[in-house]
Amino acid sequence: MEHTPQSQLKLLLAKGKEQGYLTYAEVNDHLPADMVDADQIEDIVQMINDMGIRVYEQAPDADEIMMTEDSTDDDAAEEAAAALATVEAELGRTTDPVRMYMREMGTVELLTREGEIVIAKRIEEGIYTVQASVAEYPPAIASILDQFDRYEAEEVRLSDIISGFIDPNAADIAPTATHIGSDLSQSERDKDDSKDDSKDDDEDEEEEGPKGPDPEESKERFTQLREVHENTLKIIADKGRGHPEATVALFEIGELFKEFRLMPKQFDRLVKNMRATMDKVRVQERLIMKLCVEQAKMPKKNFVKGYTADESSIAWFDTELASKKPYAEGLKMIEPDVRRCRFKLDIIEKETGLAIASIKDINRRMSIGEAKARRAKKEMVEANLRLVISIAKKYTNRGLQFLDLIQEGNIGLMKAVDKFEYRRGYKFSTYATWWIRQAITRSIADQARTIRIPVHMIETINKLNRISRQMLQEMGREPTPEELAERMLMPEDKIRKVLKIAKEPISMETPIGDDEDSHLGDFIEDTTLELPLDSATGESLRNATHEVLAGLTAREAKVLRMRFGIDMNTDHTLEEVGKQFDVTRERIRQIEAKALRKLRHPSRSEILKSFLDE
């Protein structure tokens, strides 16, 4: 009877407890043959030692065993069980990517409805922090207001700018009918899923949620934002950014702006612009530090202390220049370059209306908000990976591997996390199912075929197949393209085109015949090669032509060769041949006519007559 790895380890531990020690040879004999990782073996030996069973290179003497303190006690069985469980976990390791993914996914606990709301609030808080920070960056608000002006000029759609507005005073769970269906039994869910699966490939992509923001409310909100923005700029211009009134105004515009639910494209654009400004600042500051520390040999500690004391002026540099310190002479040599960098920083401050310290503070708070939202989104995604797998299982054997289906489903899950609105009352899984299923079905339509077909054409093919099946049931026969065109209200030529596209490619390795000893590719003509019959006929014609030309004079033969391109790359005109022989065109025509008359003689033409049918 063959022992399992677990039973082998149990025997090993029992033997060790009985004799009080083990040798490395005994440990190796009881380990699985496929365990060759030195780290794993060392971990097992360490666990055996921790249980009070010493492991030796060779069997010790009886005296040495007596001197060794017996550390095993009543808890030895429990320790052995714990160690064995750890060892079994080690033995259960696999290199199969699906199993590894499942094991890692299983370590994350599922979320309750309350847990989802907590994480959704953290995501919202992170986004709020970013938007409130960006609101203090004057070009950002001006950019959004400019986008709204373009909407009013009918250059862009309102739905390209915002998706709606957030009411911070709304309840966490809106008392709406969206709860209906979230408590279905598992069997009812399975039935619904099976129905949806049959429709997924046939339906066009639908929009989730409301169709778009309310134009009247949007106009009112943007007008309010414009007024607050202009008032804030006026206060800052009159009293300075550090004035208490300016602080209140900045807080007010931040609170107002974070209620705007910006479209991801707009949100990313604002963050990117702020990042670009911060990058410009960093470039100049790094250049100043490089000049001072590396070229002028100013101690880095002194530079950091002086520069950070007042980042909006160059007074620190003038102070260091006036000092009698050893590096003052070096600073004097780089003074033009440092002042040039400071001038560029002044331009950035003028363009943004912000001091360098304020730009850094906004960027810092924005980064904190992004990190908070990113961590919360990661938690939400990891807690719902099981949902992706349960949906992906229903789409196997459709042209994509299971891991690919999981990956595509995970992309849909991440989209669902980005768009999830917990205030509507949906449980996240109810909302995410649509996005996961949509991502998977789209990927199957886009990637499953050997020859890629656009998604919109896949939808047309699915619709055509569905109607074709219906007509087959109604008429008892396959419908004609004309009948399909009439039923689908489409031109007949388009129906024929769709039918042609819908054909599945067949492998050239498909077995043919009862014995399956030949393949489909063996019966396909290779048009790139010349047929043996044509090759033999051409060679015979070439030999016959050379034979009859040999019966002419050298001049006549050459004229015919040039005129008809025999053994040459191309044929020649009378004028070209005349230049070759230094005679007139008429003379060449006469020579050609005479040579052809000779070839028409039965003694010569008989050789070529058999090639006329070829």
Curated annotation (Swiss-Prot):
Major localization class: cytoplasm
Keyword terms: Cytoplasm, DNA-binding, Sigma factor, Transcription, Transcription regulation
A single cellular component GO annotation: cytoplasm
Residue ranges the UniProt entry marks as DNA-binding: 574-593
Gene3D superfamilies in alphabetical order: RNA Polymerase Primary Sigma Factor, Sigma-70 factor, region 1.1, Winged helix-like DNA-binding domain superfamily/Winged helix DNA-binding domain
Region (Sigma-70 factor domain-2), start-end ranges: 380-450
GO molecular function, one term: DNA binding
Name assigned to this protein: RNA polymerase sigma factor RpoD
